[in-house]
Amino acid sequence: RKFLEELGPTYVKLGQILSTRSDMIPKKYCEELMHLCSDVEPMPFEEVEVCIRDAWGQEWKEVLKEIEAVPLGSASIAQVHKAVLKTGESVVVKVQRRGIDEIMARDIALLRKAVGYIPPLSIKGMVNPEMILDELWAAAKKELDFLKEADNIEEFAEKNKDVEFTAAPGLFREYTTSGV
């Protein structure tokens, strides 16, 4: 797990996918890789502040009364911080890692080249590495657009508004950007 963290966010995302594949790797490895879903080394808070300023066009102190420097969780693409709006409402702010889309696109391109050097295997049940990379990149692209995620939250909330046992997080569109 630590090795994947050191390689960077694309490899963390790959580890997250593998963590769900006990049919491919031993269960104890899956359990360790599950930590990559929320226990990745976080960005320094100073970098979080820069990301927020770039996304909102202003310092976080203009919008938030407070924000906790230590994230609630940190994963391959983003991390989340508990905060309080100036209005007094408690919120969670999700902050995308800086340059993550370019980093992941570059890593995927490099992995595709590397896979091209591997001779094709025809072992029954063997997973095609190109297929894994396609799945990885498709999943990552969906997660990289927080505006699309906001659309999905609103759609889920609307479709399930009459279902007692479901809930969707509140959303503040005025503070929602593609990266925060």
Where are these regions (language model features)?
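Broad phosphate/nucleotide-binding scaffolds in NTP-utilizing and phosphate-metabolizing enzymes
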Residues: 1-180
